[in-house]
């Protein structure tokens, strides 16, 4: 992966871009675009298409040979300005995230990490499912596709208003399948709020509950048909955004893992018993007709009782194509031949299957979730152990105080008996009666305490006896399994020890470890029982409060509607004081609408008052903290802090100016690169024409060489014939031969002149061919240099 400072990715260092494959070139362009080294307005096809195919690449204008560079550049600029700006803002947001993190460290504000955002998304999902469970609805599952769309759209909403076209384009961009419903909320931070990790988390949770305040969004979230959800959360220094996308699917994906190298395992569940999973297709996102892998029912295990299924197959992951997974279903799952081998002649087809779900190819759930769950589990266990330890200490202290008090009471009684014995030695019967009385009172006190303690123990034992027996049974079963496994491992250890130095008896250590294990196991089960009891108690309290709230809400709505009806009836029966005419129905409706609007405004004002009150309390706490911190500081310290703050602000401005210069330089470089690519296409076109001319000239030269050879052969034949004739007859005595000889000489001279002319023409053609070859070589060298060396701006 690329570094945050915009350096070249390590896998592409020292590689000529012309030597990359198409998929590697796309990955290279995406990485350069993510780092901000390429303009995000330009699509991937603009860097790949050329003029060799005779097509008009997007952003290039018309063919370079017909118009000059200025015309092409103007058309290119107009096309670039007409593209949507939303995708650019989302891409630039990732690039500026590092700068915002640096600025947040300088200014003291908190920049939430990915772990916090993941926790926010998971807790929002838990809250939604908890609300659905209270209404006896099925939980919603994560849809990986809409999850990516919602996160992408939340990043867009940080700097923009809701745009339905952009939302639809995002669905197409991520290959969404089926209909879905959108809910979103944008909320600004409270003024002068201390932006911390806890504040951001609490604010997200508070805003999440606002979805249930709106009737439309509440209907979407609590719709029984919706069983999948995508959650997107994002924020900047002034506001937060929460996006929910809900949809209906017939199956859900529970896990996508890679247990072994080049092996994929997918687990899921059918949410509709009338359908069964039949096939899984791995496809190329860029070319959806290209199948990377397709598996049928012979690779799928299906459990009809739980409607859960698992698909396991081999898949080579060395290619760099962007992949997606498609899930095909068929009716009547009982008739699908799961885990049955099919003949080699049978080919998997998707023609009569129903495409129900499409997800991106990625590991799910994220492996980072497991580490975070483990941390959360350890933290909760530590809290439970600390709470248990604190309760144990409190019980011990109470027992010690109670025992000390009882001993003190008993000691006071004995002291009183001794005083009475010293005052009246003769009244032994009274003393013995008093001793018996004190003894009986003390015994009765102890009996009462023991009875109360026994009663408490009996009540607590009755409450947890059944669960404790179940836990002990489960612990005993696990203990037996562990003992059996331990016995097998000990047998293997014995064999290994006998081969080496013999077996050393460790029975005492094993018994001690077993004793520790049993104690720890009992302690863990006790903690689990206490946790379960506490959770059950809290759930009961929550359900009771929820029922009370619903009853009060229902009663409130009834009273509200009754009051509205009463007002309407009174208004209908009322008459105008001037005209004695009844009030029109339209006027009553307008009054009701105005009253409803005022009630909404009143509700918003109440909510705003609550927020302002909370902000007031927080500001008071912050002010107290600042007052406590400012006790040891003096005026000179504040002046020094002010100077340092000003210095840091100047550095920030300098960095922003440098960043602006780099962006301008980047834009200029992109324009030069585009112009060079256009010029390269034009030069390649000229080079092709010159090559075609060169081929034609070579053909003409070959034809003329053949003619010259034929003429030479004819000349040789005529020369031999002439020699023969000379030998047969003399030239002096024959006027015809003399005339013929003179004609031949004239013809030979003409042919020699023609030969010289053709040789001169041949030399000129050779020079033209040589010049064309030199031009072609220079063009190829300039092309290679332009691709290998960085361009300097004009």
UniProtKB/Swiss-Prot annotation:
InterPro entries: CAP-like_CFAP184 (IPR056294), CAP_sf (IPR035940), CBM-like_CFAP184 (IPR056295), CC_domain-Cilium_Assoc (IPR051885), CCDC113/CCDC96_CC (IPR025254). Residues 49-69 have a biased composition (Acidic residues). Residues 461-613, 638-775 form a coiled coil. Disruption phenotype: Mutants swimming speed is reduced compared to wild-type with trajectories wavy and kinky. Cilia length is not affected. It is found in: Cell projection, Cilium. It holds the Pfam family CCDC113_CCDC96_CC. Residues 89-103, 386-411, 431-445 have a biased composition (Basic and acidic residues). One of its GO terms (cellular component) is axoneme. One of its GO terms (biological process) is cilium assembly. Residues 1-105, 386-458, 774-794 are annotated as: Disordered. Residues 774-787 have a biased composition (Polar residues). Keywords: Cell projection, Coiled coil. Residues 24-35, 446-456 have a biased composition (Low complexity). Belongs to the CFAP184 family. Forms a complex with CFAP263; the interaction is required for functional activity in cilia. In complex with CFAP263, acts as a regulator of ciliary beating that connects radial spoke 3 (RS3) to the inner dynein arm (IDA) and the nexin-dynein regulatory complex (N-DRC). The complex is positioned parallel to N-DRC and forms a connection between the arch at the base of RS3, the IDA tail and N-DRC. This is Cilia- and flagella-associated protein 184. It comes from Tetrahymena thermophila (strain SB210).
